[in-house]
């Protein structure tokens, strides 16, 4: 498969940490990538664990950054949120919801099982138009800076292997089994159709 033809999406809950870290790394490697969230709002860590800071998906990363800077620069610098939002702003203006995207992808990576379920349910509820297959692969990635980076590199490695594959459809299952052994992670995988 030619590198320019593999169309990749990465989806997490809020399109802030895990999907954007993967977006950043895949983009640097020259892949065609988009990233998304699935929830109705973006939730970021707040002053207490049960009090997140909530934004609408229409809020830009720059607006979130400036709002958190005003609220508590020290807290949001210390926990890495300002760094994450700064990185995100360099990639795209703001978070996007997967359910509102009409683009077609070859592979969609999700970062937790509930997101995988939402993506598969959304794809199955759409009217099929082209019957083009899309592989949906879940890899559980904890929502921490370190785990987001490790998960992004694993997603990148899978994408690079798929780019070198003569037949993605035939080789994907074997590749995922090899990656499960190598990384010590298990994957969920299904095929949906556009």
From Swiss-Prot:
Alphabetically ordered keywords of this record: Hydrolase, mRNA processing, Nucleus, Protein phosphatase
One example GO MF annotation: RNA polymerase II CTD heptapeptide repeat phosphatase activity
Main subcellular localisation: nucleus
The enzyme's E.C. designation: 3.1.3.16
Catalytic activity of the protein: O-phospho-L-seryl-[protein] + H2O = L-seryl-[protein] + phosphate; O-phospho-L-threonyl-[protein] + H2O = L-threonyl-[protein] + phosphate
Name under which the protein is recorded: RNA polymerase II subunit A C-terminal domain phosphatase SSU72 like protein 4
Family of the protein in this entry: Belongs to the SSU72 phosphatase family.
GO cellular component, one term: mRNA cleavage and polyadenylation specificity factor complex
Pfam name, any one: Ssu72
Organism in which the protein naturally occurs: Homo sapiens
Role noted for this protein: Protein phosphatase that catalyzes the dephosphorylation of the C-terminal domain of RNA polymerase II. Plays a role in RNA processing and termination.
Gene3D superfamilies for the chain: 3.40.50.2300
Gene this protein is translated from: SSU72L4
Source taxon at top rank: Eukaryota
Localization annotation: Nucleus
GO biological process, one term: termination of RNA polymerase II transcription
